[in-house]
Amino acid sequence: MDESDPPIKVLSVVGAGRSGTTVLASILSEVDGFGSVGELRWLWQRGVLERRPCGCGEAPDKCPVWSRVLDATLTTAPPERREEASKIVASQRRLAKPRNRWRVLRSARGGDDDWEALVRVRSAMGAACSAYSRVTGSRVIVDTSKRPFDAAVMASLPHIEHYVLHVVRDPRAVAHSWRRSKTFSVAGEARTMGTRRLPATVRRWWASGLGAELLRREVPSSRWLRMRYEDFCVSPREHVDNILSLLGEPGPSPFEAADRVVLHHNHIVAGNPSRFTVGAVKIELDDAWRSEMRTRDQHLVELATAPLMRRYGYRLRH
């Protein structure tokens, strides 16, 4: 990016998986000037190495958007890109180690310029954002990578005007959702999104919440917004308007009605299978856990997550 260019606005969405972030990204991609990249952290693993499909159905190297982004981002020709992408992935994994996460979170304001892994990931993320903005003309990029330390990396980048949306969902609902597999179709091929056991889901929900609370100390309050999934589902248009206000982008709402929006093909590079959804969509609350989740499991989740549940306004049932 040229130093004379205006900064790119980036909204990092943090939170636990199965919290509606991909649907939210699809909605925001309908706003003029917005580009939802999905979980950008997976671009090099799932996009380059595994060639998983973009939201448009094409592999990233065949996608009209991501193929150009990769050409501008990676320094090697296609035959050697796997090695370059592998180095980025290895650095990402190093930053994700539990012993390194706090250090990454503290680097949100900059610094640690001698940490090779962090420097490599910063360079890759910054180049990808700049290239995506140039290719698509987006002035706002929505990144739903969800992990707080990925958002910290984004916050430290020069020429990025960084914002954070912390999406929370009742951990009982998250645990129940992860026990249900999701099947979707890409180019006529059926694919399944796997399940996760309750203890693993609880650990990740807790780690996500704690990481977000730590990240919040490093981000100006004027650039931070917390939103509950349940509140969003009750009044989605109002909450999307709140997000636009946070970003200083009071553009027209993409909603046709208070709870309905028409989604078009997008270029979300990684995320929940809902990124392949097109057409009219009604936003509805999924609270099946209330009737389908065993009381014992609800109690276990509550015991493990009670402090953050109370902080986020969730009532304990047991």
Question: For each predicted feature, which ranges?
Answer:
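Conserved phosphate-donor/acceptor-positioning beta-strand/loop module used by diverse small-molecule
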Residues: D143-K146, M154-R180
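Short His-Asn-centered micro-motif
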Residues: V14, V142-S145, Y229
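Short, solvent-exposed loop/turn segments at secondary-structure junctions
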Residues: R18-S19, E30, R41-L43, K146-D150, ...
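PAPS-dependent sulfotransferases, especially Golgi type II membrane carbohydrate sulfotransferases
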Residues: M1-G17, R103-V119, R179-E189, W206-G209, ...
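Gly/lys/ser-thr-rich phosphate-binding loops in alpha/beta enzymes
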Residues: M1-G55
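PAPS/PAP-binding and catalytic site of the sulfotransferase fold
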Residues: G20-F34, M154-H159, R226-G251, T277-A280
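PAPS-dependent sulfation machinery
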Residues: E39-I141, S185-R191, K282
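A glycine- and Lys/Arg-enriched "phosphate-lid" helix/loop adjacent to the NTP-binding pocket
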Residues: L165-H166, V174-W206
